[in-house]
Amino acid sequence: MANKKIRIRLKAYEHRTLDTAAGKIVETATRTGATVAGPVPLPTERSLYTIIRATHKYKDSREQFEMRTHKRLIDIINPTQKTVDALMKLDLPSGVNVEIKL
């Protein structure tokens, strides 16, 4: 291939599904003969939302909700055409966002 590296960035709300998806990608890439660096855990984004429990008054009574976005980075170095074909056919769990840069 002309490009020497494929960078895959994974995002998910649950870290277990993210780790299984990363494991599938790493296993597929190593099986087809490419060199893999990662999965590298990136910092987790944490979004915190505070709402008032009551509808009209009692502003001191609040509730907080949090949403965490876990991220992983995988570099595939010197991929072959067989590696790219295998990655295109790979079935990943739902709930995992995949960004690929060539």
UniProtKB/Swiss-Prot annotation:
Taxonomic lineage of the native organism: Bacteria, Bacillati, Bacillota, Bacilli, Lactobacillales
Free-text function comment from the UniProt entry: Involved in the binding of tRNA to the ribosomes.
Keyword terms of this UniProt record: Ribonucleoprotein, Ribosomal protein
Any GO MF annotation of the entry: tRNA binding
UniProt keyword Electron transport present: no
Subunit structure: Part of the 30S ribosomal subunit.
PROSITE patterns cross-referenced by the UniProt entry: RIBOSOMAL_S10
NCBIfam families: PRK00596.1, rpsJ_bact
One annotated GO biological process: translation
UniProt keyword Ribonucleoprotein present: yes
Organism: Streptococcus thermophilus (strain ATCC BAA-491 / LMD-9)
Name of the protein described by the UniProt record: Small ribosomal subunit protein uS10
Single GO cellular component term: ribosome
Family: Belongs to the universal ribosomal protein uS10 family.
